[in-house]
């Protein structure tokens, strides 16, 4: 009898084995099936500022400098994003793209977004730890949103971003534009040390692009427009500015440096721009540089690293950070008086939680030999700025 029961048990196990294996295989197959996901996003920036001296465009006050709503969606290795912004009583298209992520090391993105160019490309416009993008970066147009196709590669010790760009939404919608700025660019980074608490990174980016062509341009030659406001959002006063007619192609190069150790970090870039000109006019050159020093005062005890963008990660909740920096820009060269600026600043950033942060900062910004300031300030002006920001995002 016992032998009979034993034989029946063995037979039952043998019969159930294939069904169990089939069930496990079916469960694994279901787990591997891609799923569609969708998530709303929102961002709000409330800024307040006091200026000394004030007047002539520098008016103390508060403003909602940026309101954005959007949606992100994903399906397997595919994902996309659409953001619509509203600020200063104007609607503006923000990020609009679709991307394919081959794996954790390679991705391809197509749409309207900020390309990988220089260290500033690692941080969104609203997440600059010094409130705003460096004046050098703004003046030379190093990190605008552009229509483009981008390929990114992120390896343990190397990062690379390659793009082809086809101008901005503003260029394509402007009157009399016959051809937008078209270019190619790349960012190349070497990071022999890149982990939480220790980063040593160097890199270089290069961008070569054509000018903007309009029907009104004489002899079919192109033009470039370079400008930067004083680094504050409550008052919008142009600090530097130059318009180049009879322009040829532009070359923009920026080496970068990022170092961090525990609660301290340093990041810096140098910019060099050269624009060829026609009709025997001399080439236009501009240059600039900035350096930021970071320190975590409370909360996190060391800086984290974001390998997918080759930059510092956002500090964690309940972390207080101080950032001090200096920015120099020289946009004046031969017959072009774009302006020369100096900017010194200190910012305190408190990351309350993953949805909310507060910033408080002081900066001294001065410009001279600037055609943009000629009418109101005789080409030269300085201002002290105390500003605060509450930022909400999810």
Could you describe each region identified by the protein language model?
Residues 39, 197-201, 208, 212-236:
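Glycan-binding loop/region signatures in secreted carbohydrate-active enzymes
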Residues 3-4, 360:
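Hydrophobic alpha-helical segments, especially transmembrane helices
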């Amino acid at each position: 009898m016992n032998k009979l029961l034993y034989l029946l048990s063995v037979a039952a196990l043998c019969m159930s084995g294939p069904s169990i294996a089939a069930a496990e295989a079916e469960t694994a197959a279901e787990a591997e099936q891609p799923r569609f996901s969708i998530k709303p996003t929102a961002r709000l920036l409330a800024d307040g500022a006091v200026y000394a001296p004030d007047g002539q465009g520098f008016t103390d006050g508060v403003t909602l400098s940026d309101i954005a709503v959007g949606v992100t969606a994903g399906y397997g290795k595919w994902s996309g994003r659409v953001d619509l912004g509203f600020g200063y009583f104007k609607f503006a298209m923000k990020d609009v793209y679709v991307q394919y992520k081959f794996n954790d090391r390679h991705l391809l993105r197509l749409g309207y977004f900020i390309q990988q160019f220089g260290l500033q490309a690692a941080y969104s416009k609203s997440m600059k730890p010094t409130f705003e993008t460096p004046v050098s970066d703004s003046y030379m147009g190093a990190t605008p949103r552009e229509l483009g196709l981008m390929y990114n590669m992120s390896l343990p010790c190397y990062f690379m971003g390659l793009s082809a760009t086809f101008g901005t939404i503003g260029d394509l919608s402007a009157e009399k534009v016959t051809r937008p700025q078209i270019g190619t660019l790349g960012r190349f980074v070497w990071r022999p040390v890149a982990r939480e608490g220790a980063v040593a990174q160097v890199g270089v980016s290069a961008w070569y692009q054509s000018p903007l062509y309009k029907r009104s341009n004489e002899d079919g030659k192109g033009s470039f427009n370079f400008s930067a406001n004083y680094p504050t959002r409550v008052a919008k006063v142009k600090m530097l500015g130059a318009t180049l007619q009879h322009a040829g192609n532009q070359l923009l190069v920026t080496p970068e440096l990022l170092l961090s150790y525990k609660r301290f970090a340093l990041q810096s870039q140098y910019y060099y721009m050269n624009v060829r000109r026609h009709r025997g006019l001399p080439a236009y050159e501009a240059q600039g540089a900035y350096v930021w020093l970071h320190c975590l005062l409370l909360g996190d005890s060391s800086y984290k690293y974001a390998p997918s963008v080759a930059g510092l990660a956002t500090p964690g909740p309940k972390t207080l950070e101080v950032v001090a920096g200096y920015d120099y820009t020289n946009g004046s060269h031969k017959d072009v008086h774009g302006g020369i600026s100096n900017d010194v600043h200190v910012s305190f950033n408190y990351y309350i939680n993953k949805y909310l942060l507060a910033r408080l900062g002081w900066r001294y910004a001065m410009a001279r030999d600037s055609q943009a300031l000629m009418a109101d300030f005789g080409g030269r002006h300085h201002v002290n700025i105390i500003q605060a920001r509450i930022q909400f995002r999810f």
